[in-house]
């Protein structure tokens, strides 16, 4: 129930659909804690990310949809990611044979970091499928936190290798794509 999830928080109902809406880090922490408590699903970040189509990101999403290549869309996302939020920074670079999308926390999110990281990675994955529906899924995921207890239930659904306790949270895929 949206009303119950937002009760007492400085968040307007329906703001998730507004590309201009902003949420402070403190409000995000309170909301993420409540979301997990209400759903009983600590992996809710994966579902949240999957529910955000490109169009939910306003002009940035539409610009990505009009990009000629996935590389162009990623370049736009990195360049303008800060217009969507300031809690994390998105960085893209090539490392050997890998193209890397890296999330850098701009302030410590502690126990709430996994929810944000997982929702962003899920969102990026499904937006990539919107842009290139026929692409084979190759790559790996790296997370800068220990493996959560709930992850053993998710692992079979994720078609790429997954690593925890890494230096950074990254999505990696073959650079030639």
Task: Kindly label every feature range from the protein language model.
Residues 67-177:
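Alpha-helical bundle regulatory/interaction domains
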Residues 1-102, 137, 148:
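N-terminal low-complexity or simple alpha-helical regulatory segments
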């Amino acid at each position: 129930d949206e009303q119950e999830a937002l009760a007492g928080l400085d968040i307007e109902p329906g703001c998730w659909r507004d590309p201009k809406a902003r949420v402070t880090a403190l409000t995000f922490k309170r909301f993420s804690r409540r979301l997990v408590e209400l759903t009983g699903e600590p992996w809710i970040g994966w579902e949240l990310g999957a529910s955000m189509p490109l169009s939910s990101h306003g002009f940035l999403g539409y610009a990505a949809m009009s990009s000629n290549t996935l590389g162009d869309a990623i370049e736009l996302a990195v360049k303008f990611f800060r217009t969507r939020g300031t809690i994390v920074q998105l960085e893209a670079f090539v490392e050997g044979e890998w193209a890397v999308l890296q999330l850098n926390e701009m302030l410590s999110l502690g126990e709430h970091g996994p929810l944000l990281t997982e929702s962003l990675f899920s969102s990026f994955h499904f937006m990539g499928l919107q842009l290139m529906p026929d692409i084979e899924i190759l790559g790996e995921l790296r997370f800068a936190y220990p493996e959560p207890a709930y992850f053993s239930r998710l692992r079979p659904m994720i078609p790429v290798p997954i690593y925890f306790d890494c230096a950074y949270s990254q999505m990696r895929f073959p650079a030639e794509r």
